[in-house]
From Swiss-Prot:
Entry similarity comment: Belongs to the TRAFAC class translation factor GTPase superfamily. Classic translation factor GTPase family. EF-Tu/EF-1A subfamily.
Function: GTP hydrolase that promotes the GTP-dependent binding of aminoacyl-tRNA to the A-site of ribosomes during protein biosynthesis.
InterPro entries: EF-Tu_GTP-bd, EF-Tu_GTPase, EFTu-like_2, EFTU_2, G_TR_CS, P-loop_NTPase, Small_GTP-bd, T_Tr_GTP-bd_dom
Transmembrane segments: none
Name of this protein: Elongation factor Tu
Gene that this polypeptide is encoded by: tuf
Residue span of region G2: 60-64
Location in or out of the cell: Cytoplasm
Length: 399
């Protein structure tokens, strides 16, 4: 297929397939690429190519993930699929594959199962904002009433976890039949279902805000004093844009301070502005070097606040991944590595949980010894003696 087809003028969206094991996530991923490849919008990816996902390391955690890309008439998509349940959990918690939306695959022969529930909960906790449902294997269910029952069950389950169950598009079809049809060179009723699914994804999952359109935030990595000019803080702009003349806040560790940007530099050249992804030095007016330390963030005023207490969804590494060899208990006090610094904190386990084993994922409450700029969705590593023993994401700010 001609490479020119991938023209980047279309808006880009990251999605993924989620759902219970053997409900057809990987088959659906293959079917989407097969059906769209017939329209010249994707390269045909075989099921086995997707299922033999390469292992990647994200924050020291090994995750098997397949990434495929395709287009619809309206958009360019990057689609992530994981072969194993544990890979999903790790992927969603570490943010290795950020999802702007997800396709929840449910076999109509089984209805929602344990991992269906777990993936919906994880999507809610880690901030996957939109879900579209594909009811798979409808060719294997003779009674349409049974399919309706499954549909109602799915809506209720989504509502239980705070998703708008009645508004979420539910598309019925068969991934396997669509894949067979497309491979045989046909465009039949099953392929049409895949196109219906992609239309729903196009219209229901909004195009995400670009990083440069978000509020400015830069984690501070280093601080220098330039005689006669003031204090320079360096770091990689995480989101937004910073311009000379902007009023900004220094947030975290110490009481919040307000200051003014008097210069932005990159590679020793002066710039008018720095944007998301740039490694910059920002010159601050009237800020003393001792007022700033690594671990603070430079941010648009009032856009982020310092906190010490939060709930989080975490994955604890196995021994094989270089994690702990033993469980931990209530009041465990590791370091939480947030953006650029380690902060000690204590962990409270949920009621009824006595200990957490390596390889578990669990919801915890954390209290840090000093405040850090945090918001829902902030990711962190849990470290002990410089080694990563876990990975997490803030699901709720408590104080």
């Amino acid at each position: 297929m001609a490479k020119e087809k991938y023209n980047r003028t279309k808006p880009h969206v990251n999605i993924g397939t989620i759902g219970h094991v053997d409900h057809g996530k990987t088959t659906l991923t293959a079917a989407i690429s097969a059906v769209l490849s017939r329209k010249g919008l994707a390269e045909l990816k075989d099921y086995s190519n997707i299922d033999n996902a390469p292992e990647e390391k994200e924050r020291g955690i090994t995750i098997a993930t397949s990434h495929i890309e395709y287009e619809t008439e309206k958009r360019h998509y990057a689609h992530v699929d994981c072969p194993g349940h544990a890979d999903y959990v790790k992927n969603m918690i570490t943010g290795a594959a950020q999802m702007d939306g997800a396709i929840l695959v449910i076999a109509s022969t089984d209805g929602p199962m344990a991992q269906t529930r777990e993936h919906i909960l994880l999507a809610r906790q880690v901030g996957v904002p939109y879900i579209v449902v594909f009811l798979n294997k409808t060719d294997m269910v003779d009674d349409p009433e049974l399919i309706e029952l499954v549909e109602e069950e799915v809506k209720d389950l989504l509502k239980e976890y705070g998703f708008p169950g009645d508004e979420i598009p539910i598309i019925k079809g068969s991934a396997l039949k669509a894949l067979e049809e497309a491979k045989a060179g046909g465009d039949g009723e099953w392929s049409a279902k895949i196109m219906e699914l992609m239309d729903a994804v196009d219209s229901y999952i909004p195009t995400p805000k670009r990083d440069t359109d978000k509020d400015f935030l830069m984690p501070i990595e280093d601080i220098f004093s330039i005689s006669g000019r003031g204090t320079v803080v360096t770091g990689r702009v995480e989101k937004g844009i910073v311009k000379v003349g902007d009023t900004v806040e220094l947030v975290g560790i110490k009481p919040t301070q307000t200051t003014t940007v008097t210069g932005v530099e990159m590679f020793r050249k002066e710039l008018d502005e720095g944007e998301a992804g740039d490694n910059v030095g920002v010159l601050l007016r009237g800020t003393a070097k001792e007022d700033v330390e690594r671990g603070m963030v430079l941010a648009k005023p009032k856009s982020i606040t310092p906190h010490t207490k939060f709930e989080a969804e975490v994955y604890i590494l196995t021994k094989e991944e270089g994690g702990r060899h033993t469980p931990f208990f209530n009041n465990y006090r590791p370091q939480f590595y947030v953006r650029t610094t380690d902060v000690t904190g204590s962990i409270q386990l949920p009621e009824g949980t006595e200990m957490v084993m390596p390889g578990d994922n669990v919801k915890i409450t954390v209290e840090l010894i000093h405040p850090i700029a945090l918001e829902q969705g902030t990711r962190f590593a849990i470290r002990e003696g410089g080694h990563t023993v876990g990975s997490g994401v803030v699901s709720k700010i408590l104080g």
